[in-house]
Amino acid sequence: MSPNNQNEYEIIDALSPTSVSDNSIRYPLANDQTNTLQNMNYKDYLKMTESTNAELSRNPGTFISAQDAVGTGIDIVSTIISGLGIPVLGEVFSILGSLIGLLWPSNNENVWQIFMNRVEELIDQKILDSVRSRAIADLANSRIAVEYYQNALEDWRKNPHSTRSAALVKERFGNAEAILRTNMGSFSQTNYETPLLPTYAQAASLHLLVMRDVQIYGKEWGYPQNDIDLFYKEQVSYTARYSDHCVQWYNAGLNKLRGTGAKQWVDYNRFRREMNVMVLDLVALFPNYDARIYPLETNAELTREIFTDPVGSYVTGQSSTLISWYDMIPAALPSFSTLENLLRKPDFFTLLQEIRMYTSFRQNGTIEYYNYWGGQRLTLSYIYGSSFNKYSGVLAGAEDIIPVGQNDIYRVVWTYIGRYTNSLLGVNPVTFYFSNNTQKTYSKPKQFAGGIKTIDSGEELTYENYQSYSHRVSYITSFEIKSTGGTVLGVVPIFGWTHSSASRNNFIYATKISQIPINKASRTSGGAVWNFQEGLYNGGPVMKLSGSGSQVINLRVATDAKGASQRYRIRIRYASDRAGKFTISSRSPENPATYSASIAYTNTMSTNASLTYSTFAYAESGPINLGISGSSRTFDISITKEAGAANLYIDRIEFIPVNTLFEAEEDLDVAKKAVNGLFTNEKDALQTSVTDYQVNQAANLIECLSDELYPNEKRMLWDAVKEAKRLVQARNLLQDTGFNRINGENGWTGSTGIEVVEGDVLFKDRSLRLTSAREIDTETYPTYLYQQIDESLLKPYTRYKLKGFIGSSQDLEIKLIRHRANQIVKNVPDNLLPDVRPVNSCGGVDRCSEQQYVDANLALENNGENGNMSSDSHAFSFHIDTGEIDLNENTGIWIVFKIPTTNGNATLGNLEFVEEGPLSGETLEWAQQQEQQWQDKMARKRAASEKTYYAAKQAIDRLFADYQDQKLNSGVEMSDLLAAQNLVQSIPYVYNDALPEIPGMNYTSFTELTNRLQQAWNLYDLQNAIPNGDFRNGLSNWNATSDVNVQQLSDTSVLVIPNWNSQVSQQFTVQPNYRYVLRVTARKEGVGDGYVIIRDGANQTETLTFNICDDDTGVLSTDQTSYITKTVEFTPSTEQVWIDMSETEGVFNIESVELVLEEE
């Protein structure tokens, strides 16, 4: 036979009796099983999962006798996947019953010994006899306890109303749980943690599954809710403990096998593969045992990729001619790291579409030759995504195509060529077994004797048949083996496999929780740094996002007609060292409208910490409509991680169908918890931490309850929340909390720019909107609102707290003022609701939908380190402490809200000022010290205040001729009024330092004297015949050239005549033939004279002249005391009189011009 005549040796298809692909039938219940299970009743279902149906599941007894520990591990994982969650209809599948049959089969095969023996071989470490004996003995006890419990559970299921059956199953549950928990120490004995690891993982699984049952049946067995809650808390704790133990000792065993040579890598990879199957796959399913998080039937998928041995491993020694590839001599073998780098790193999940195989040829002497598989080009595709090629090996020679398409390769049989003599090496032929019951064989000519072995992939990853298998081929890589002289001896392929539970599509079920691992997304884009990392806790890779940029992850999913009309909650399992928010959006090809929801997530770990079980948490949306319409059943989901520096790990996305009745029950439970959380245990008082906003939110929850399903519960909850509202209002020391009247007699005082809002989407009660500060000319006038808590309402040495809620704000200052000011500044984003606000059918506020968004975002906020003291938190509360109470002083506490900037604003409501409690300990001592310091300071303030007050009062008293302040004393001049005014203005502490709009301690005294001074000014203006003679109204009433102006010097208005050609005049009316006194206070600066001339209609004239000689020093002075007052008598003959003022050179400053009628 010629080696070049290969036409007759093309790929041979071995067709099955039927070539129809049935992708819905897979390894036991590791897929959707749509066709198989759709019409199955629960009895058939239980029979199938308990292995009575040979078509769908193996018989545990026959399996154990034929296969090894890996096969048992595969069957156990598949059995668990089949029974996750709680079906909507029918009984809960007893995973426990099936596992008992697998772990303690009827043929008495000791599976636990097989587990231990296998790990001994993998890591070359024997388990001490005493350690093994203790473990086996405790396993026997565990078996008895679990079987007895399972028997009682089945009896109770048949007689659910029997108190005897309930009592028995309750007793046996407690016994089984205790024994399983106690025995776990036997499977983690010191120095044998890794050899016992599969035993530990299986025992842990049994314990957690037993604990799961009390969450499902506990109430029916008679457990009080407190006990059920305690069991749940313990289950969560043990799940974390068991998971961390498994990962820790898996890593320890793997690292122990790390080496440098090719054979060491084979051992390393074999341990990794088999421990994934026996341990880590199980750990990945532990979270699904949580019946509270997974209360529905659940579809789980494992997307990790494992690799079988390089073809031709572990064959040396079976015959004198057969040799493993790594024992070839002389050969330049690949290193440990070279082989490790051949494997595909964690990445997006792909499906194998096609294999193009290339053939190499080797001649050995003149007679022997053979063709062998030299390399391959794989065509891979993402889920609903694009295809791409991967190459490996020698890409030369004849090309053969193995189409895969929508089928799976579940089994491969290789013929390995590994002859010691002449170091012959290769693979030929190879048979691929497909899930449509066909086989395709690659076979090429060869002619030589000896050194051949047939290797079946089923020896490493077991299968039942084309309908029932655990893994599919996902990847192939290969490497050359050369002699030390460089001659190619052959090529060795390595096969990658994924679990068959990972479906070819991302299907969302209408009645099951659908888990879609994150690496089944199709692409990602954005500014964050991202990569996939091995997820030892997760059954597949996790996506790590880091850096400050945002990132969009695109996921295409599919559903059926029933699923298209279903609403879902979307839940993301993640870990993060910083809180943040996901935005979920969906759209289908036939419905371009985008449906979106926000999901807040909290930080679950410290910065750059390693992943553990407990670092993973769930972030969940409210019910949303995915917007699926038309005939299309595929649509796109986008998950956007907001910008912000963080290390975020995403495990999977879950779609939880919303069942109307279930959702109503859940809503009732949430409302009950919210209302109960408002009260103390006695239900007669509020929790001190409860806020008015929380009471309103609880009312919203009650409002959304179904009237048809829960009329009585809703009525009772309404009564409770109304009582809570009454108690909130009773403890609130603020007046007018409904903002009925701003600037009324009692309550709030405010500036312009305050709007009272009713029906705001965030506030059930009335709320306030504060606009930005106003800017007029160069002055900025803040928007403010304040209220004083009267001293009589306060208690000594007590802490009071201000609480409230902010919809959004910018530069909002909130102050509490007593002896000192406490202040916070709030810059709160408007981020609680989506851009399109929820409305009801009438176009009004949809409180039910609004609640979901608000709760999700507040959950994120409440996880912050600073709580509601953070500047961007929506809720706020901060305190102030009192010292001694002084009713005479009536300092009280001032509550202030202020917008000081022109771009500031705020919306706020639910304001409360409440007593928190008396001070004690160090806080009390500190307050007493502060009080003493304050009293000392007040004594000094009072002394200074009294001195300035009495000086000002005496100055004002001297202005008046009577006690009724109706007449000025004769001879009172403007300078007297200005002097008195200066004294009044010198009174300190008139306004509050923190907010000038708030009266200070001397405000009343200051106001009294200011009013009297104003009366003096009014009387003075009446006696001065010249209007605006003091220029307090600028140039009003005066005629002046454009260069003349009035300047404000201290509290005095001064007319400034700057030039010799400047002119100021006024015409006014007097009583003719009466004697007046013209009095002018002025000052001349520089050379020249200043003139004030008065004349009447008869040309009668008097002149007052000012120059620098009027000052005794003769030196130019800017001091106000240098102003000179001059007078002259004037008796006008006419009613009309004129005043003219000018100067010859320099500057002429005039403070006042008076024409006063002399008394007789």
Curated annotation (Swiss-Prot):
Function, as annotated: Promotes colloidosmotic lysis by binding to the midgut epithelial cells of insects. Active on various scarabaeid beetles such as Anomala cuprea, A.rufocuprea and Popillia japonica.
Other known facts: Toxic segment of the protein is located in the N-terminus.
Swiss-Prot/TrEMBL keywords: Sporulation, Toxin, Virulence
Protein name in the entry: Pesticidal crystal protein Cry8Ca
The organism's place on the tree of life at top rank: Bacteria
Family: Belongs to the delta endotoxin family.
UniProt record, GO biological process: sporulation resulting in formation of a cellular spore; symbiont-mediated killing of host cell
PANTHER family for the chain: ENDOTOXIN_N DOMAIN-CONTAINING PROTEIN-RELATED, PESTICIDAL CRYSTAL PROTEIN N-TERMINAL DOMAIN-CONTAINING PROTEIN
Record GO terms (molecular function): signaling receptor binding; toxin activity
Keyword Metal-binding: no
Keyword Magnesium annotated: no
